[in-house]
């Protein structure tokens, strides 16, 4: 075998090896990039769901006030709140297109389609019944609570399907915090009734109150176990050490101490509603902080994936070019 043929054979073997290695590395890098892009969509979707849940929680509170007063109060506030809710629904539906839904797992697809096609579609029907006082307060509250629960469950599924452990954990923390905040919203309604009556009207409502406290505690504990330290610190600084949280705690202690003593819960229900709403608004600030942190983190993951892909591509092209240049140069030198 001549020197020329040996050089050509060696070059072909080297090129084949480089092409093969580059193909596998580029495929892996491209796969990582696609995962990062898919994860980015999931994170953005989670933040949009959180914003919608926040507005639905406020609409649930306004609806409870409207129905509880027999339609005499909160009418204007309820109509204004519905507009804010509708705005967030449109934002979610715009982002949640068919192509994206089809890329989700079967379980997530089923839940999203159920929420969008059933829950949100039924919202308009429930509103009509509320306006005409054709639905009970309990049924209306249960509808909103079920809808919120389904929406939060969808965020939990996105966390479950995430292939990035760090982001999956923070999404899980995000989910648990959303659950805790939703339970705080229900507590707001329950104690509003108790304070309006200056006692718990029955043991069922008191049991509901105790259960809500236990659920909030459990969700906050799960949140604390999964959340990064910076998020926990922000939560403690923003919510735990705040004035509204201290006041809410005092109201809760009073309700637990004398639940059935007539006149013992001598608290202005409007004052209670205002204070716990302040606490819930502070909790929403934590949600926004987590969302911002998640989006910042996913941008880093995406940038790293892009850099890896571009790096592999550049190294592959340079390696191929070097082999070709060396081979051609060797053939020329031999030819001379």
Per-range role (PLM):
Residues 1-335:
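Hydrophobic alpha-helical segments
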């Amino acid at each position: 075998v001549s020197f020329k043929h040996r050089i050509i054979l060696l070059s072909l073997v080297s090129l084949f090896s480089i092409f093969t290695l580059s193909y596998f590395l580029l495929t892996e890098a491209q796969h990582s990039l696609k995962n990062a892009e898919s994860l980015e969509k999931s994170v953005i979707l989670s933040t949009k769901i959180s914003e919608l849940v926040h507005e639905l929680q406020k609409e649930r509170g306004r609806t409870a006030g409207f129905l509880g007063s027999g339609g005499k109060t909160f009418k204007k506030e309820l109509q204004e709140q519905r507009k804010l809710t509708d705005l967030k629904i449109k934002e979610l539906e715009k982002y949640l297109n068919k192509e994206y839904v089809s890329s989700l797992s079967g379980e997530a697809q089923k839940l999203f389609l159920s929420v969008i096609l059933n829950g949100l579609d039924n919202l308009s029907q429930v509103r009509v019944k509320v306006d005409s006082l054709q639905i009970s307060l309990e049924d209306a509250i249960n509808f909103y609570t079920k809808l919120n629960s389904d929406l939060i469950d969808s965020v939990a599924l996105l966390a479950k399907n995430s292939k990035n452990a760090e982001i999956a954990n923070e999404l899980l923390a995000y989910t648990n915090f959303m659950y805790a905040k939703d339970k705080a919203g229900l507590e707001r309604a329950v104690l509003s009734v108790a304070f309006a009556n200056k006692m718990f009207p029955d043991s069922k409502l008191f049991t509901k109150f105790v259960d809500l406290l236990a659920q909030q505690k459990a969700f906050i504990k799960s949140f604390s176990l999964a959340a990064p330290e910076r998020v926990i610190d922000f939560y403690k600084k923003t919510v735990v050490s705040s004035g509204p949280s201290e006041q809410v705690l005092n109201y809760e202690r009073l309700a637990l101490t004398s639940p059935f003593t007539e006149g013992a819960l001598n608290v202005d229900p409007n004052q209670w509603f205002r204070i716990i709403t302040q606490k819930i608004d502070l909790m929403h600030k934590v949600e926004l902080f987590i969302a911002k942190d998640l989006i910042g983190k996913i941008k880093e993951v995406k940038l790293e994936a892009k850099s890896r892909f571009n790096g592999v591509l550049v190294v592959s092209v340079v390696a191929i070019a070097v082999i070709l240049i060396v081979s051609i140069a060797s053939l020329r030198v031999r030819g001379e």
